[in-house]
Amino acid sequence: MPAFSLNAYVALSAVLFALGGIGVLVRRSPLAILMCIELMLNAANLLFVAFGRAHGGYEGQIMAFLVITVAAAEVAIGLALTVLLFRRRAEVDVDRVNELKL
């Protein structure tokens, strides 16, 4: 099975990152924003692993593992804040939340 070239991985990663960035800017639901941030982080993971494979080292996989760990913490904190926001205000629209004090 032939492997894809590094350019294909870079292009796919750029497209995924751009889609995630557009989703963060356009969406108003905190859950959708979290999913788009996860898409952006996975695009970075793909790029790390692709460059690591192209250069024959394990550094890309180590960085991808680190990003996955940070993403798990980000999701846990983001979901906790979303649940807290919903309990306090009975809505989760990020446009209506303009102050940090709940």
Swiss-Prot record:
Keywords: Cell membrane, Membrane, NAD, Quinone, Translocase, Transmembrane, Transmembrane helix, Transport. NDH-1 shuttles electrons from NADH, via FMN and iron-sulfur (Fe-S) centers, to quinones in the respiratory chain. The immediate electron acceptor for the enzyme in this species is believed to be a menaquinone. Couples the redox reaction to proton translocation (for every two electrons transferred, four hydrogen ions are translocated across the cytoplasmic membrane), and thus conserves the redox energy in a proton gradient. Gene3D superfamilies: 1.10.287.3510. GO terms for biological process: ATP synthesis coupled electron transport. Its main location: membrane. This is NADH-quinone oxidoreductase subunit K 1. InterPro entries: NADH_UbQ_OxRdtase_chain4L/K, NUOK/Mnh_C1-like. NDH-1 is composed of 14 different subunits. Subunits NuoA, H, J, K, L, M, N constitute the membrane sector of the complex. One of its GO terms (cellular component) is NADH dehydrogenase complex. The keyword Transmembrane applies. It is a multi-pass membrane protein. It comes from Symbiobacterium thermophilum (strain DSM 24528 / JCM 14929 / IAM 14863 / T). Belongs to the complex I subunit 4L family. The chain crosses the membrane at residues 6-26, 31-51, 65-85. It comes from the Bacteria. NCBIfam families: PRK05715.1-2 (NF004320), PRK05715.1-3 (NF004321). It is an enzyme of class 7 (translocase). It is found in: Cell membrane. GO terms for molecular function: NADH:ubiquinone reductase (non-electrogenic) activity; quinone binding. It catalyses: a quinone + NADH + 5 H(+)(in) = a quinol + NAD(+) + 4 H(+)(out). Its EC number is 7.1.1.-.
